[in-house]
């Protein structure tokens, strides 16, 4: 099962994850530099993992999938070793 949420990346390279029902633009005061969607799941070894993708229409910001997936995995302690 995959769980999809939204996120923003702040200028301090921190990820803020929130439910899909909330608009990205609700976080505009945080001065996001990118935004999109994050999917959570389980990898082939049974460990939690995540993946960032998409864009925010309400903020007009794209995601940077590879960079932001790494940021998310580091901050959420989901590194694939």
Residue ranges of predicted features:
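Intrinsic low-complexity, intrinsically disordered or marginally ordered coil/linker segments
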Residues: 1-81
